[in-house]
Regions:
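Acidic, His- and aromatic-enriched active-site or binding-groove loops in soluble protein domains
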Residues: 62-73, 178-206, 291-293
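Glycine-rich, mobile lid/loop segments that gate access to catalytic sites or pores
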Residues: 162-173, 178
Length: 347
């Protein structure tokens, strides 16, 4: 008799019992319904791509987390998000699409990071993106979080906040403080502030050769606490320091004003100058969404503006903005804390 192999699932991979899978599918269906209501079209892209396609703009932490392998003469990578495949898709099918192109995609992605609470190696993302041809109105940067607000309310989630920043504001501040040359590394360090805290971020900045006094002054700005109005006033003190900052500040305040205009209550969004987003392709507005009183789950929904992502696949200018819900993570948050809309639960 052959040896019995233990039936087990790899760490970081989700496998549900039927009653839980039913709930998961209902949540996914509700997301699709809301996305379609706002005029987004469904899209599905391959899980496997040529590594040159997916890694054209990767770098940094992303390259450390990818699943990459060779099959014959092919160098293949499993998709680590749904945004890079979208950029390739739009560039490839440009002549067949109508712009602004609004798409949603719900599918599995793969990252070889350490499995822990709220973090998986195989997980579902539920994305919406708006891609323009040549230009894309800043109004779209505000529409995205307003859609998330309405979707989360439909799911029965009430205790969340969308934290908003702008990469140009950050880059302008780095220039003002004389650390522009280290901007990419500083962004990655700041992106860890919720995980490792201000003191450890300051320590890593100093290790990066940022003067201790400069690191402290920079973090004083990025961690400044107060209302959205207070933070706008704080940032006004840097107006005119450089063109990049001024452009980002204008975009940030415009987005905040439009979010209010879309009817999102002030309790559900806030300016957070420490939000950086770890992926390298964001160029302007950035978002992260957190469940209040549950920091252990991290961001359940994040994204932002990317003006240059498609440049690796086409010479056309195809700016975009989008947001991605970590559906697998959100599912566990909803079920473990009884946040789920009763209509979505199993009978």
């Amino acid at each position: 008799m052959s040896e019995i192999v233990e039936p087990r699932t790899l760490s970081g991979f989700m496998e549900l019992l039927p009653k839980d899978q039913v709930i998961f599918e209902k949540i996914k269906s509700e997301m699709e319904k809301v996305y379609r209501r706002y005029g987004f079209y469904p899209l599905d892209t391959p899980v496997l791509e040529d590594s040159r396609i997916l890694l054209a703009k990767a770098g940094g932490e992303t390259e450390k987390q990818i699943y990459r392998f060779n099959k014959g003469d092919s160098d293949l990578t499993m998709r680590f998000d749904l945004t890079v495949p979208l950029a390739k898709y739009v560039a490839k099918n440009y002549s067949e699409l109508t712009f602004p192109f609004r798409r949603y995609q719900i599918g599995k992605v793969y990252r070889g990071e350490r499995a822990q609470k709220g973090r998986f190696r195989e997980f579902y993302q539920a994305d919406i993106d708006i891609v323009g041809d040549g230009s894309l109105s800043i109004v779209n940067d505000a529409e995205i979080p307003s859609i998330i607000y309405n979707l989360f309310n439909n799911l029965g989630i009430d205790n969340f906040v969308i934290r908003i920043n702008n990469r140009k504001v950050l880059n302008g501040l780095f220039d003002n403080f004389g650390v522009k040359e280290s901007a990419v590394d500083i962004l990655r360090i700041i992106d860890k502030i919720d995980k490792i805290g201000r003191d450890n971020v300051a320590k890593e900045l100093v290790e990066l050769k940022v003067p201790e006094a400069t690191a402290s002054q920079l973090l004083d700005v990025l961690t400044f606490d107060g209302s959205n109005e207070d933070k706008v006033e704080k940032l006004k003190g840097f107006a005119g320091c450089n063109e990049v900052f001024d452009a980002g500040f204008s975009e940030l305040t415009t987005v905040i004003d439009y979010i209010a205009g879309f009817g999102v209550p002030a309790d559900y969004y806030k300016i957070d100058l420490s939000i950086a987003r770890g992926l390298d392709y964001y160029t302007g507005t950035v978002y992260e969404t957190f469940i209040k009183n549950h920091p252990e789950y991290g961001s359940v929904c994040s994204g932002g503006r990317y003006d240059n992502l498609a440049e690796y696949y086409t010479k056309k200018s195809l700016p975009g903005v989008g947001i991605s819900i970590g559906l697998t993570r959100l599912f566990y948050v909803l079920c473990e804390n009884n946040f789920l809309n009763r209509e979505l639960e199993c009978p």
